[in-house]
């Protein structure tokens, strides 16, 4: 009985940790339990004495502070890693949303389900159905990318007229003031037609003068610039990146010096600016330049501080000395992008966004706005492009036949088709969920990094899959090619607004560990202010959190999450439970990694990357489940849900395993493996059978397939190859029953080619009606249009054709 009572005590302690019961109530429960066993004479009353001695220093706050918290604070202050001003501002900027729940080890799934489903207003829907549809119709991507290297003038005029560049600008300034969800849907639709079109519209509606002015501009700046930006009278760009500072934007060498100078015939307080920027979208044609630079005030004209820090200003590009106009040539996706320079240019101090009082506040301004823009523009462009490619390649795989069958029925093709379908569904779910947070007023900095990374990364891999399936159809550029420009341009999204290698290795977990953790940010703040009381509260909350995560990880590992709470009882129930387990694992290993590695974790980028991978996969899986919930739990969509969640669970577990195999302290890693994987690994990648289901969903018209391509431009217009493929798919499907009947009558399988000739002969023999003959002929025309590739005159492809000189007439000499 004594052994059983000790086991019961250990179970009781574990239950208290598992449910995160506070220290005072836990101490009371343990004392009552011990007293009860002592009263039953199973234990001696003397057992209470050591228990009280252990608990008193923990529950008496003044004693706890002096014995534990104060010494711990001194140690923490000595080992806390140095943090630059830009790092601190990046961490302080923005908010924590759903990713915080996932990081803390016990997600509140009901809270996730209760987040409002984003909806379009009638005005937003009308804009998408009208002006956006028309802009898509006007866009000829081959003309844009190959012939003009720009949008045609009439499309530029249309975008300005319909205020495409003013989606984020408030109505009081003449803007559209659309929601984040509406912006995402607009960009997705445009991206499915032309990457250049989507980038051109997306950038002014992301991080740029419009966004910065609305948040930080003076009233005079707002009233002057915002109406002009809304009308398209001003074309904005924002210059941050320098040749010497790409991903390390805080190291920009561009400078401004506060001084007095002459401006329009008067001596005014201003700045002398010198900059050299590159990769700046819209810079070649911009009329107003948003500029980030490091401002200094050596003469103390603004105050006592000399090095004020990163500052943002608006510079009209007609200002003497401003250099714009040259262009970069990014991967045959020639959107307006180029360098800008200026040397010792004097401008008034009022050019600072927000006026002189915002001098030195530029980095905070940028990271606060970036968390919103990065969560909308790049994920939407990547997702929209893939949604259209998915529809096109699904139709093509059905139409294209080899060895007398549709290539989409071949297992080798089904595998990449499934990845395309699954990733399209997951990416759209992830991009949609973050817009919910933004519409609720959140600025989820960590989540925007997750969505940017995984949408662009998965999008690139999926477009590569589509190119493999398309083969020669995808290789040959021309108006009929629906995949090659997306394939060429995918690295652009990978690179910009935080290169993906940097984002994965440093940002997702680097910021997440501090922002999303329930106690680390408070501990750091207490350490910086040397506040023992605040540190005591955070420290003991942190210790309880670690204990809870360890108990939860071990128990949920033994049961594979089966005892944990879920919001539903259907076939997705187990997914919530398995995510509960992985969330607890992440919480535990994050604390262990920070505790063991300390400040060196900043330099252990592969450890940080794997922890970030776990957090990312938790988000992608939960976004997939949220989408399924928001769309009414359509059972026909379950294969997509199964694939998305199973893939995320498998990748998260793989990251856990890789983390433990490569953890620098092998003893700690071994102990953690016992806690996290008490019965070994349990998750598998999606099965071949599930891949087969997804491949079929992508090829055959259905409500589920329509949801995969929701909101895209699928009209079969002249310059929309995806829309033409969609129409061809319907034509081919309509012809198949007729072809099958004729094959049966012929007693053999007739080839699904030359259907027009088949129709002619069958009609002459009275085997089919005129209507059926017309269907076969139409299907043949659509089939040939779908599988053929573009061809050009030999001289049409050269940018600068070589003019051949007339050959000299050769004279033959007599022998």
UniProtKB/Swiss-Prot annotation:
Gene Ontology molecular function terms on file: acyl-CoA dehydrogenase activity; flavin adenine dinucleotide binding; long-chain fatty acyl-CoA dehydrogenase activity; medium-chain fatty acyl-CoA dehydrogenase activity
Listed EC numbers: 1.3.8.7, 1.3.8.8
Protein transport recorded as keyword: no
Organism domain of life: Bacteria
Pathway per the UniProt entry: Lipid metabolism; fatty acid beta-oxidation
NCBIfam families documented for this protein: FadE_coli, PRK09463.1, PRK13026.1
Protein name per the record: Acyl-coenzyme A dehydrogenase
Native source organism of the sequence: Yersinia pestis
Name of encoding gene: fadE
